[in-house]
């Protein structure tokens, strides 16, 4: 017997935040930054429906918006991503990612942490986090689409790392492997 899970919502604001977060992802993936920004403002006005998980995802999407709009301050974004991770992980340990049970939002936050570390010149952290995420995703049960999307996002950051360390051949091979999965 196959059962499909459907979310339940305690209030209308809870539903509105959930739905708006999905819309923001759609707009960001379509590079429609103005409606994404407007929806993020709307979610903030709803006070994230008093839900720390919505707030954490909102912070992630806010960072994505800043990066895609070209307005990102990488030091600030790095700290914002660390803050977002601390909402559910009070003690962040990049060395122990493989031993954690992470949500897809937390995985994305770790990927963004690696990317921001790379932009700040911390190639060792970027390399380590990307490797941890890659092995983590290979060993966890996720839907094929979700795993492929997260692996592709991680591959983008790892490719940037490889380009930074001038390993062009590996960067080409990795980008070619994942170029159709985003």
For the regions a language model picked out, list residue spans one by one.
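Basic, Lys/Arg-rich alpha-helical nucleic-acid-recognition elements, primarily the DNA-binding modules
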Residues: 1-14
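Internal amphipathic alpha-helical repeat/solenoid segments
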Residues: 2-5, 37-49
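Tandem amphipathic alpha-helical repeat scaffolds
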Residues: 19-31, 59-72, 105-122, 150-166
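Helix-turn-helix repeat elements of alpha-solenoid scaffolds
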Residues: 27-43, 69-94, 120-139, 164-179
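Short acidic alpha-helical/loop segments enriched in Asp/Glu that coordinate divalent cations
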Residues: 144-149, 169-173
């Amino acid at each position: 017997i196959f059962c499909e899970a459907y979310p339940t919502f305690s209030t209308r604001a809870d539903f509105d935040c959930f739905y708006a977060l999905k819309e923001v992802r759609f707009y960001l993936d379509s590079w429609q930054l103005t409606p994404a920004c407007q929806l993020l403002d709307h979610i903030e006005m709803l006070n994230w429906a008093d839900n720390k998980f919505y707030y954490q995802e909102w912070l992630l999407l806010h960072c994505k918006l800043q990066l895609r709009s070209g307005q990102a301050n990488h030091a600030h974004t790095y700290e914002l991503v660390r803050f977002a991770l601390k909402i559910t992980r009070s003690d962040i340990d990049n060395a122990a990612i493989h031993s954690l049970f992470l949500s897809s939002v937390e995985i994305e936050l770790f990927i963004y942490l690696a990317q921001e570390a790379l932009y700040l010149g911390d190639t060792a952290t970027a390399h380590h986090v990307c490797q941890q995420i890659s092995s983590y995703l290979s060993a966890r049960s996720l839907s094929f689409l979700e795993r492929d999307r997260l692996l592709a996002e991680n591959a983008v950051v790892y490719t940037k790392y490889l380009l930074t360390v001038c390993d062009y051949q590996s960067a080409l091979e990795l980008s070619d492997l994942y170029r159709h999965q985003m």
